């Protein structure tokens, strides 16, 4: 049985999503990754999914494109996919 996760969009993620659309990024790529995560599917290796450390410990990051990232967290006991941020490396890390 496939478990489907409820998706929680933070207010910051909503702003980041609108910014991605304004930048004319391919939103379908982001939506496809969100769908895969919500359906508990493993992401392809090209997305470089990995755990984060520091201020983002407990979250994961995957690459939508080389300089377009998605931060997310899956809370298994609640079956919730939380989407705190998306953006470029400089948007997210200030570099």
Protein language model features and the residues they cover:
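Residues forming the ATP-binding cleft of Hanks-type serine/threonine protein kinase domains
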Residues: 87
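Basic, Lys/Arg-enriched alpha-helical interface segments
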Residues: 1-66, 75-82, 90-95
